[in-house]
Amino acid sequence: MVDLSFNATVFMQMFHFLLMLVVLRLFAYRPLMNVIEQRQAYIADEIEAAEKQKAAAAELRSQLEADLAKAREEAKAIVARATKASDEQAQAIMEQARTEAQRLKEEALAEIGREREKAIAQLKDEVASLAVLVAAKVVKDGLTIDAQHNLVQNAIKEVGQLQ
């Protein structure tokens, strides 16, 4: 059978157990809980700082990508302007060359025209001189038709020799 007698050691053990719980709570659990709370706060701060750095890095990346795209567009614009300027310069040079060639051609044609006029004038003078000589011989000699024919042939030969 079971003995249900009252034993004071049980109460003393319960008292010591409760006293030990109070002492542990005051001196062990509270500092341990403070350390755990500090560690949790530190970890939370580190996570928050990492998220901020990640957001800053993403913002910096998007900024750099935007700057790179802008730089590429500026480079394309510079290349386009340079290409356009070189095309315009090439067109200007070609137009200047055409103008100069046209001017030289016109000068050459004018010079040829002057030389032609000079040659024609000189030829007219020679023909006039020959005509005067022929007329003088015809008048002086009173030539026959055959003699006149021979005289004209000789004059033509002389003109051929002058050229």
Curated annotation (Swiss-Prot):
The name this protein goes by in its record: ATP synthase subunit b
Keyword Transferase part of the UniProt annotation: no
Membrane spanning residue stretches: 10-29
Job description of the protein: F(1)F(0) ATP synthase produces ATP from ADP in the presence of a proton or sodium gradient. F-type ATPases consist of two structural domains, F(1) containing the extramembraneous catalytic core and F(0) containing the membrane proton channel, linked together by a central stalk and a peripheral stalk. During catalysis, ATP synthesis in the catalytic domain of F(1) is coupled via a rotary mechanism of the central stalk subunits to proton translocation.
Main location: membrane
Gene that produces this protein: atpF
Species assigned in the record: Desulforudis audaxviator (strain MP104C)
GO molecular-function terms, A-Z: proton-transporting ATP synthase activity, rotational mechanism; proton-transporting ATPase activity, rotational mechanism
Keywords, comma-separated and alphabetical: ATP synthesis, Cell membrane, CF(0), Hydrogen ion transport, Ion transport, Membrane, Transmembrane, Transmembrane helix, Transport
SUBUNIT field: F-type ATPases have 2 components, F(1) - the catalytic core - and F(0) - the membrane proton channel. F(1) has five subunits: alpha(3), beta(3), gamma(1), delta(1), epsilon(1). F(0) has three main subunits: a(1), b(2) and c(10-14). The alpha and beta chains form an alternating ring which encloses part of the gamma chain. F(1) is attached to F(0) by a central stalk formed by the gamma and epsilon chains, while a peripheral stalk is formed by the delta and b chains.
Pfam family name, one: ATP-synt_B
Localization of this protein: Cell membrane
Membrane-topology annotation of the record: Single-pass membrane protein
Family classification: Belongs to the ATPase B chain family.
Lineage, broadest ranks: Bacteria, Bacillati, Bacillota, Clostridia, Thermoanaerobacterales
GO cellular component, as recorded: plasma membrane; proton-transporting ATP synthase complex
Origin superkingdom: Bacteria
